[in-house]
Amino acid sequence: MKPPSTLTDGVVVLRELREDDRAVVLSTMCDPLVAAWLNMPADPTDRDFDSLLRVVRAGRVSGERIDYVVTEAGADMALGSVIASRRHRGNYELAYLAGADGRGRGLITRAVCLLCDALFEEGVGRLELRTHPDNEPSQQLAQRAGFRREGVERASIWLHGSRVDAIVWSLLPEDPR
């Protein structure tokens, strides 16, 4: 799948990660509300951003991973990100994060819905996401975006050096949203 470089619903814009996002991304990676749920360095450096940028660009070229920075229409500051990674049988797994300026305004939920719509338009038949059982804001976002809770995968993800459970959520094109 060759994703478009930008998507918009008129309120949010999803665009590619750029070099000039470096300061905002590094700051977001240091945010305790983000770092608690992701495996990333405790004190990210320019080298970590460079590595992320390489992964994002390689994923887009191969079609295995689609990363977007979330911004508001009419503004260009990164507020968060949404990611879709190709999994087995043509399914995709979504992930998202919200920086401090992107929280509590519904923008990341809109971004997730926009990406879901684009993937379904391309013929993807199933989307999944996984949340930590204690990450209530992420679970609430999944529900607002129309995802259905399927169950718990025990010890299925690594987080800060330990295996932890994950709640599995799914969304099909025909699901009500």
Each model region followed by its residue ranges:
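Acyl-donor (CoA/ACP) binding surface of acyl/acetyltransferases
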Residues: M1-L33, V70-R177
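A short hydrophobic/aromatic micro-motif that marks alpha-helical segments and, especially, helix-coil
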Residues: L17, A36, T45-D48, R60, ...
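Conserved GNAT-fold acetyl-CoA-binding loop/helix
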Residues: L33-V55, I66-Y68
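Juxtamembrane helix-loop transition sites at the ends of transmembrane segments
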Residues: D48, R54-R57, I167, L172
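Short loop/turn motifs at secondary-structure junctions and domain boundaries
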Residues: A58-G63, F147
